[in-house]
Amino acid sequence: MKIVYVYDSIARIGGMERILTDKMNYLAEIYGHEVYLITSSQGNHPLSFPLSDKVEHIDLDTKFHLQYQHPLLEQLKVGWTLNHKFEQKLKKEIRLINPDIISGNTSFKADLICKLDCKAKKIIESHCAKIYTRIPANRKKSFFKDIKDRYVSYQCFRDVKRYSDAIVTLTQGDAAMWGQHPNIHIIPNTTSIDIQTISSCEAPRVIAAGRLTW
């Protein structure tokens, strides 16, 4: 089976990047599937987690972050140009690979992935609570930018619900936020951390892990 993962880059040391890398490695190494990683803007950045040699990595060299250097109106123009460039390159690679499954993420071009004209089933993973998705960490308090972000999010979520073959969330609560969809699956994150010893529980230290940062 041919499986394509589409993401912006595996350059940050984050939970989402680790999980995606673990999945791709597992599907390629253990199940023997043909796995492809298509990134938009990996560039010369090293992969933040080890990727199996059996996973083929294709970078489309479309640096979306460059649009945010411009004022809002110019952002729209530059953003449209980058989107068009990325869409054409992605469609070309999909035609060449002819995959059975394409997996995307709600944080990156999920609406475009869902509407690709090909035989592949489109699976969209939601690694964040829906109401917090697509909110940039450096978000500026601007009325017009807020309106733009809300519209883009609405459009993306509408298309994901309409065109995706399946939505994968991490928790029951996340799944409920998507409302009525014929094919929602709840798959918690896995861990590949190899623990050699069991804690004695004597150290006066508490570690808390959370997903919501806004």
Residue ranges with predicted function:
Residues 8, 62, 106-107, 126-130, ...:
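Histidine-centered beta-alpha loop that forms part of the nucleotide-sugar donor binding/catalytic region
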Residues 88-92, 130-132, 144-166:
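Membrane-proximal helix-turn-helix segments that form the acceptor-binding/catalytic region
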Residues 4, 199-214:
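Conserved donor-binding/catalytic core segment of Leloir-type glycosyltransferases
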Residues 173, 190:
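Carbohydrate-associated surface elements
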Residues 3, 101-103, 116-137, 147, ...:
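Active-site proximal beta-strand in glycosyltransferases
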Residues 90-109, 123:
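Short N-terminal targeting/anchoring amphipathic segment
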Residues 12, 192, 211-214:
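Nucleotide-sugar-dependent glycosyltransferase donor-binding/catalytic pocket residues
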Residues 5-13, 26, 30-77, 177:
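N-terminal strand-loop element at the rim of the active site
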